[in-house]
Swiss-Prot record:
Sequence position, cross-link Glycyl lysine isopeptide (Lys-Gly) (interchain with G-Cter in SUMO2): K6, K8
SMART domains the record matches: Sm
Any one GO cellular component localisation term in the record: extracellular exosome
Subunit-structure text: Core component of the spliceosomal U1, U2, U4 and U5 small nuclear ribonucleoproteins (snRNPs), the building blocks of the spliceosome. Most spliceosomal snRNPs contain a common set of Sm proteins, SNRPB, SNRPD1, SNRPD2, SNRPD3, SNRPE, SNRPF and SNRPG that assemble in a heptameric protein ring on the Sm site of the small nuclear RNA to form the core snRNP. Component of the U1 snRNP. The U1 snRNP is composed of the U1 snRNA and the 7 core Sm proteins SNRPB, SNRPD1, SNRPD2, SNRPD3, SNRPE, SNRPF and SNRPG, and at least three U1 snRNP-specific proteins SNRNP70/U1-70K, SNRPA/U1-A and SNRPC/U1-C.
Protein name: Small nuclear ribonucleoprotein Sm D2
Amino acid sequence: MSLLNKPKSEMTPEELQKREEEEFNTGPLSVLTQSVKNNTQVLINCRNNKKLLGRVKAFDRHCNMVLENVKEMWTEVPKSGKGKKKSKPVNKDRYISKMFLRGDSVIVVLRNPLIAGK
């Protein structure tokens, strides 16, 4: 019987480990697996409406991640005084050398479009 069809409750710890590895290599988490193996950048949209562009060093099934060389990007609308027109949004960013990202704040993870196209 294939590991994908067998109920998890009937699996040995070794079979569970093998199945998780298989899912990480073929399932949706394969984007993160490839990023770790090839040291490529990913773009992560977060729930705080910020984007993170960086390299994934490690991750788990909850999408918790250790990231390096991260550029955090967001937009801010400056406060306008009385009688002034609406201000235009301003793009902001900052560099973070190492960070831990909790998985529940992740919306979507994309391969770096500049490299993925090659």
